Amino acid sequence: MSNTQSVTAVAKYIRMSPHKIRRVLDQIRGRSYQEALMILEFLPYDAGGPIWQVIHSAAANAKHNSGLDKKKLIIDKVFADEGPKLKRIRPRAQGRAYKILKPTCHITVVMKAID
């Protein structure tokens, strides 16, 4: 059994649909830390911003808490869970109202060091 350390970072209540976040997460899963940051920098999706922050935070956790080198980190697991929906009302004609649901999500990144 290998003795690899893993570090985790979580961003909660991101005001974006988990479906849109997962589209970007699939591009970086299994890649190295630096390669993932380069991919996120050039993707045309808004979801790249919050994901970039979480990956950066996980790398900082690895360096500060576990003393791991950022260059040796790879993204082991990354996923987006559904968060609570913000409920809003849009006024419509003749006194009616439509419900608007604004989705949120939680992004989790688990990185491990390779030897």
From Swiss-Prot:
- A single GO CC term, please? chloroplast
Sorted alphabetically, the keyword list is: Chloroplast, Plastid, Ribonucleoprotein, Ribosomal protein, RNA-binding, rRNA-binding
Which locations, inside or outside the cell, does it occupy? Plastid, Chloroplast
MF annotations from Gene Ontology: rRNA binding; structural constituent of ribosome
Where is it mainly found? plastid
Output the PROSITE patterns linked to this UniProt entry.
Answer: RIBOSOMAL_L22
Q: Name one GO biological process term.
A: translation
Signal peptide residue numbers: none
Q: Name one Pfam family in it.
A: Ribosomal_L22
The entry describes its oligomerization and partners as: Part of the 50S ribosomal subunit.
Describe the task this protein carries out.
Answer: This protein binds specifically to 23S rRNA. The globular domain of the protein is located near the polypeptide exit tunnel on the outside of the subunit, while an extended beta-hairpin is found that lines the wall of the exit tunnel in the center of the 70S ribosome.
UniProt lists the family membership as follows: Belongs to the universal ribosomal protein uL22 family.
**This protein's name:** Large ribosomal subunit protein uL22c
Q: Which organism is it from?
A: Phaeodactylum tricornutum (strain CCAP 1055/1)
